[in-house]
């Protein structure tokens, strides 16, 4: 039995990844601060039975994260995988952004990700002692690779995620824990959708930002995460994989 914990599991990329891993036979513990979203998650995937568990967890709270992983540890002796997809988006120029928004971005996107990995690590290392290679996948962004106006603080958090990925990959390799990240471009998620265009038409402003002529769906990113969680990725460590339709390669400017 392969067991994965997924933060931000109730929506967006976390939801898509939960579905994908359940379909591939994983037992998934979905973590989110949205209790109604977790209830909806359980209802949507009730057919997977006891292979889906949920736990309320606010990654911005060290106490909440510790409690969630203590609960996981009491139920399971190990974790084979961790996907940190909980995230926050705030838009604004660096000279105008409120201190509260700046702090909130780092609290969730960087500190929350690190807290989750820190609390999960004993369970991930336990899988390594059983001869398995445990997996950690972080959600970075092409914003951490290529920056643009109005997203400086968000970009800084994602650049930090990339740095954490590479350092943790080296630190944890001896314990048979692989650490990688995916770096999506614009993805059609509830977090991103309000920032895309008037009227909620997610293709209105974004159809030209990718050489493929569309923005990503959560399933596009979940597929790459599933690969990194699979045995086929057993020699991939410290990688940051763009899932962007060629956006970074083409240097297509935002429209």
Name the predicted role of every residue range.
Residues 117, 157, 165:
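Active-site helix of classical SDR
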Residues 146, 226, 237-255:
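Short C-terminal tail/terminal secondary-structure segment
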Residues 141:
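Residue(s) in the substrate-gating loop at a strand-loop-helix junction
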Residues 83, 173, 178, 236-238:
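Short, small/polar-rich loop/turn modules that mediate ligand/substrate recognition or access, typified
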Residues 93-94, 101-106, 206:
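Substrate-binding pocket helix/loop in short-chain dehydrogenase/reductase
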Residues 122, 170-174:
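Alpha-helical segment proximal to the catalytic Tyr-Lys
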Residues 95, 146-152, 174, 213, ...:
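Active-site loop immediately N-terminal to the catalytic Tyr-X3-Lys motif
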